[in-house]
Design a protein with these regions (language model features):
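Bacterial Sec-dependent N-terminal signal peptides
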Residues: 1-23
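Non-catalytic accessory segments of hydrolases
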Residues: 20-184, 208, 448-461, 469-479, ...
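Extracellular structured ligand-interaction cores
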Residues: 35, 104-108, 123, 152-153, ...
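Serine-hydrolase-like catalytic core of hydrolytic proteins
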Residues: 91-274, 303-306, 312-337
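Surface-exposed helix-capping loop/turn segments at secondary-structure junctions
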Residues: 113-122, 201-210, 270-275, 396-407, ...
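Short, solvent-exposed turn/loop segments enriched in Gly/Ser/Thr/Pro and often Arg
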Residues: 161-164, 214-218, 410-417, 480-487
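Substrate-gating cap/lid region and adjacent catalytic-acid/histidine neighborhood
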Residues: 238, 246-247, 276-452, 464, ...
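Mature extracytoplasmic/periplasmic domains
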Residues: 422, 475-504
């Protein structure tokens, strides 16, 4: 027995030591719910506090309820490892996690701060991960906050509920709710995380009145939502959107009755009564979610979202703050149309099927005939109808209905060769590839043969983002000048971010105005 206990003690000590930062020593922060112990890295000068609870675990009676204020804890809570990530399928290979497994108990956030003892009122970045509201986690290497913290910014990533666990709506849940609606739990988690940052970030040297929210894909859609939401909009000082807005056709919020009906039909498919369904285990629910493959949309719940985003922006009710946004030059590849060879005739058939009476006008705007030009045209059409138009509409709404500066980019840097020496198609920058550039994390993301060009582009994009987070203006530090846009300009300035970044007049806005005539009538 003694031998066993000694072995167990050695293994335990070894595991603790392996989890510790070899260059670190303990640091402490006092937040509203208690004392946290994090790590100070003496090589970087950055403090990290990982796995901080910002709400009670949404389990048991708190499943499918809005986030509840975190309980006080006694003593010192260790904040040195990432908390569990939300329950989710394995979706995309570029999601590389450092979190401690998966759990419904997932409402944790992470803080990287450069603050020294005398520092206070540092600018703050709160970053929402992407993943279609069905996957993702704040521990992913590409979202790491250390590089941006070295720029004098307090960085936070926040976990939120996903898929069935985060967006399930049902009439019975709505009856129980104090605001008589259901769904949107993941977005409510984000809003609660933002409120936690507002209330506690001073403990990490951050300025609660200088919080910029940002995100990519579903994180960008979430950023647009919180600019509009009455629960969130007063807590932010700026917003950055990378590829996506919660505007038709990119996952626009649906009426509560429609979301509730999706929930009713899902429960019916499972063969359980509603009462039985509520009591199922995490594993049982996850199995049913995988089996039935239902998407649970954002909801117009009258609480987090009283109206659609266009309606809120047109009424000038959104956060009146500086906005920096953009998208990538090939968000969706030509493969969206099927297998090679691509032909103009095949493309025209797809356009006519999709655009119906508007097909002739669409084909004039998407005019590539053959070869690489045709591939770019196919990519443009697929990308625009996926999330480029919605991001442009967000841009257009804010410049029209705010006196705050708006900055727009087009990220165009091609991927380098991968570790096998294979080069991707040379038609543009694909979806999500800019994240590690913008946040300065190339060195943490494996699988690519990064070059000096990549590092240069990363320094430029990170520099623009850091300047914007600090001042509401991306310009400075000898970066190429980035003009703000005017409300009525049909060819507004766009910062093309590439090996040689430069501002150019927008060339493709006629496409977005065309799509606006189709999509804006259905908000």
């Amino acid at each position: 027995v003694k031998t066993f206990l000694l072995t167990l003690a050695i293994v335990t000590i070894a595991s603790i030591l392996s989890a510790q930062n070899p260059n670190g020593f303990p640091v402490h922060a006092v937040v509203n719910s208690g004392v946290l112990e994090g790590d100070y890295d003496n090589k970087t000068g950055i403090q990290t506090y990982l796995g901080i609870p910002y709400a009670q675990p949404p389990v048991g009676d708190l499943r499918w309820r809005g986030p509840q204020a975190v309980n006080q804890w006694s003593g010192t809570r260790m904040a040195k490892t990432f908390g569990p990530r939300a329950i989710q399928k394995h979706m995309w290979d570029d999601m590389l996690f450092r979190s401690a497994g998966l759990s419904e108990d997932c409402l944790y956030l992470n803080v990287w701060t450069p603050a020294k003892a005398k520092d206070k009122n540092l600018p703050v970045l709160l970053y929402f991960y992407g993943g279609g509201h069905v996957a993702g986690d704040g521990s992913e290497y590409r979202y790491d906050g250390e590089s941006m913290a070295k720029e004098g910014i307090v960085v936070i990533t926040v976990n939120y509920r996903l898929n069935l666990f985060g967006y399930f709506a049902h009439p019975e849940l709505s009856k129980e709710s104090p605001y008589k609606a259901s769904g949107n739990y993941g977005a409510l988690d984000q809003s609660a995380g933002l409120q936690w940052v507002k209330d506690n970030i001073a403990a990490f040297g951050g300025d609660p009145n200088q919080i910029t929210i940002a995100g990519e894909s579903a994180g960008s859609m979430s950023t647009s939502l919180h600019m509009a939401s009455p629960l969130s909009r007063d807590n932010i000082a700026g917003a950055i959107g990378e590829s996506g807005a919660l505007i038709n056709p990119t996952g626009p919020p649906v009426p509560l009755a429609e979301a509730e009906q999706i929930g009713v039909e899902f429960v019916k498919k499972t063969g359980y009564t509603y009462e039985e369904f509520r009591e199922l285990s995490t594993a049982e629910l996850f199995e049913l979610y995988n089996k039935h493959n239902t998407y649970f949309p954002i909801v117009l719940d009258g609480y987090l979202l009283p109206k659609s985003l266009p309606e809120i922006f047109e009424a000038k009710e959104q956060a009146q703050v500086p906005l920096l946004l953009g998208w990538n030059s090939a968000e969706m590849g030509a493969g969206a149309m099927g297998k090679r060879p691509f032909t103009r005739a095949k493309f025209e058939a797809v356009v006519r099927q999709r655009m119906k009476a508007d097909a002739d006008e669409a084909l004039k705007l998407y005019a590539g005939a053959e070869g690489q030009e045709l591939e770019q045209t196919i990519s443009d059409f697929a990308s625009d109808n996926w999330l480029v138009y919605s991001t442009w509409k967000w841009f257009d709404l804010h410049r029209e209905h705010s006196d705050q500066p708006v900055y727009r980019y087009l990220y165009s840097k091609l991927r380098p060769a991968n570790d096998k020496g294979e080069r991707p198609p040379a038609i543009g920058a694909p979806h999500a590839c800019e994240i590690e550039y913008a946040l300065g994390n190339l060195h943490l993301v494996s699988g690519w043969q990064w070059t000096e060009d990549d590092r240069q582009v990363s320094a430029t994009m990170k520099g623009y983002f850091a300047n914007f987070i600090k001042t509401g203006n991306p310009n400075g530090n000898d970066l190429p000048a980035w003009p703000t846009v005017e409300a009525k300009d049909d060819t507004p300035p766009v910062m093309v971010i590439d090996v040689e970044s430069k501002a150019v007049d927008a060339k493709n806005d006629a496409r977005y105005r065309f799509l606006d005539g189709i999509y804006h009538s259905n908000k």
